């Protein structure tokens, strides 16, 4: 896992250079939004279960996947879906705090699409639920923090598509 600081420094180090104006601007932006990211993470942490519950209600609860024969039918499959959404929310929050999506590749996306396809998990429904979670989260944390979190939700959706 990297963060925005490590990413900027590693890039300069690989090139054997000091940090240039562009690198300094990236660091400045990261530090400027630090308090916003910490407040958003605190709000998300305190409301994680409610965020997931509302996202499921908005996107999956009354769709074909929850009816008999659907991929979320049976309590066990439904619970696994809820667990996965909570997992995506948690790791998107970590990535937002770090200002870098690398943790999403390392801990969430590597091999996930293939696993879902082999298990018959409907990726489209999963992406729909993540987009609903993005909307619910933005409503809770505000527009600026919601846009920042949205970057990482979109990153997960892109990795699954």
Curated annotation (Swiss-Prot):
Domain of life of the native organism: Bacteria
Membrane topology per record: Peripheral membrane protein
GO biological process: photosynthesis
Binding site for (2R,3E)-phycocyanobilin: 81
Keywords: Antenna complex, Bile pigment, Chromophore, Electron transport, Membrane, Methylation, Photosynthesis, Phycobilisome, Thylakoid, Transport
Pfam families: Phycobilisome
List of residues that carry N4-methylasparagine: 71
Subcellular location as annotated: Cellular thylakoid membrane
Gene Ontology cellular component terms for the protein in this record: phycobilisome; plasma membrane-derived thylakoid membrane
Protein modification: Contains one covalently linked phycocyanobilin chromophore. The chromophore is added by the phycocyanobilin lyase CpcUS.
Disulfide bonds: none
Subunit structure: Heterodimer of an alpha and a beta chain.
Role noted for this protein: Light-harvesting photosynthetic bile pigment-protein from the phycobiliprotein complex. Allophycocyanin has a maximum absorption at approximately 650 nanometers.
Family: Belongs to the phycobiliprotein family.
Protein's UniProt name: Allophycocyanin beta subunit
């Amino acid at each position: 896992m990297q963060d925005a600081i490590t990413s900027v420094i590693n890039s300069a180090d690989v090139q054997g250079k000091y940090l240039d104006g562009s690198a300094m601007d990236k660091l400045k932006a990261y530090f400027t939004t630090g308090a916003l990211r910490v407040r958003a993470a605190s709000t998300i942490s305190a409301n994680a279960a409610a965020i997931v519950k509302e996202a499921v209600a908005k996107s999956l609860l009354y769709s074909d996947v929850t009816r008999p024969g659907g991929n979320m039918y049976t309590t066990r499959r439904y619970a696994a879906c809820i667990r996965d959404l909570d997992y995506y929310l948690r790791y998107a929050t970590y990535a937002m705090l770090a200002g870098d999506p690398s943790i999403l590749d390392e801990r969430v996306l590597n091999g996930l699409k293939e696993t879902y396809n082999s298990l018959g998990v409907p990726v489209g429904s999963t992406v729909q639920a993540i987009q609903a979670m993005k909307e619910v989260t933005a409503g809770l944390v505000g527009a600026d923090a919601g846009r920042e979190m949205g970057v990482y939700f979109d990153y997960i959706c892109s990795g699954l598509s």
